[in-house]
Amino acid sequence: MIQTETRLKVADNSGARELLVIRVMGGSKRKTGNIGDIVVAAVKQATPGGVVKKGDVVKAVIVRTKSGARREDGSYIKFDENAAVIINADKSPRGTRIFGPVARELREGDFMKIVSLAHEVL
């Protein structure tokens, strides 16, 4: 579960390396987000020459969480880190590559471009 002030690793090559969650999108009372949810975040670390700079406020979709997610068949999926992919207003990724595995739950959330760029879908 991802909440305000959570730090996320960035799983793409947009230039950002670490994000700080400002808000989980989806209503004023929403406290936590899980895989496939959109968050508003600030860039805390960035690589030089990247598209995204330190201090930028961006939208990102959560692709991996330590707490995991329960699937329809009753199984759970967990990852070793919390990670997100920075997206545009039309839900397409800002970067051109996705690093590491992503969860299958992204297919249901209209993030097919991220799923197609990912090396491994679990």
UniProtKB/Swiss-Prot annotation:
It comes from the Bacteria. SUPFAM superfamilies: Ribosomal protein L14. InterPro entries: Ribosomal_uL14, Ribosomal_uL14_bac-type, Ribosomal_uL14_CS, Ribosomal_uL14_sf. Keywords: Ribonucleoprotein, Ribosomal protein, RNA-binding, rRNA-binding. PROSITE patterns: RIBOSOMAL_L14. GO terms for cellular component: cytosolic large ribosomal subunit. GO terms for molecular function: large ribosomal subunit rRNA binding; structural constituent of ribosome. Pfam families: Ribosomal_L14. GO terms for biological process: translation. Signal peptide: none annotated. Part of the 50S ribosomal subunit. Forms a cluster with proteins L3 and L19. In the 70S ribosome, L14 and L19 interact and together make contacts with the 16S rRNA in bridges B5 and B8. PANTHER family: 50S/60S RIBOSOMAL PROTEIN L14/L23, LARGE RIBOSOMAL SUBUNIT PROTEIN UL14M. Binds to 23S rRNA. Forms part of two intersubunit bridges in the 70S ribosome. Belongs to the universal ribosomal protein uL14 family. NCBIfam families: rplN_bact. HAMAP family: Ribosomal_uL14 (MF_01367). This is Large ribosomal subunit protein uL14. It comes from Lactobacillus delbrueckii subsp. bulgaricus (strain ATCC 11842 / DSM 20081 / BCRC 10696 / JCM 1002 / NBRC 13953 / NCIMB 11778 / NCTC 12712 / WDCM 00102 / Lb 14). The gene is rplN.
